Regions:
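Sec-dependent N-terminal signal peptides
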Residues: 4-13
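A generic "folded-domain core" signal
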Residues: 20-175
Length: 175
């Protein structure tokens, strides 16, 4: 009986430690993928940092992307959510990616998800149209893209990809 109890305790401890290790490793992943019923692979690039283009500004953005692919083809719009950390207290009116050659890629359906003036942030949900997903991700990875945010008080802030975000995008490209 003692051997059975000891064996049972060892099995439980192995299961608990392996599940903890699995969840710990999953939390470290910068890009998550999942197979969808549509037979496409869904990619989720976890929030990565974008720094203010104006180095003196006390602001940054944490941005994430969620989209689907069929092999090498992007087959869905990208849900592009971001949290802007600044002390403006203003709502986000619009946002767009500025690419080389003065090309502007709008983020549509801007919806406020959360806002806290005391903590200095606002979180929004947006849509990046399917035909621009690959172009924007590549431009962000190559530092050829700026996120421009217009606030309802008329101010505009611009953000560039940090090395952290570039690493996340590169990981998504490799999956």
């Amino acid at each position: 009986m003692k051997k059975l109890v000891l064996l049972f305790a060892m099995i439980i401890s192995v299961l608990v430690s392996s599940s903890c290790a699995t969840s710990y490793a999953r939390d470290k992943e910068k890009v998550l993928t999942a197979y969808m019923e549509s037979k496409y692979l869904k990619y989720y690039i976890r929030p990565g940092r974008m720094d203010a283009e104006n180095k003196g500004a006390d602001a940054h953005v944490m941005i994430d992307f969620s989209y689907q692919m069929n092999k090498r083809a992007y087959v869905s719009d990208a849900y592009t959510n971001f949290t802007c950390y600044n002390r403006l207290g203003a709502f986000i009116e619009s946002a767009e990616f500025l690419l080389p050659n003065d090309e502007k890629v709008p983020l549509t359906e801007v919806s406020t998800l959360d806002r806290d003036v005391k903590q200095g942030y606002i979180r929004v949900s947006t849509i990046l149209a399917n035909q621009y997903v690959e172009k924007v991700l590549k431009a962000l990875h190559e530092s050829n893209c700026v996120l421009s945010i217009t606030f309802d008080d008329g101010s505009i802030q611009s953000f560039v990809a940090s090395d952290d975000l570039k690493t996340r995008i590169l990981e998504a490209f490799s999956k």
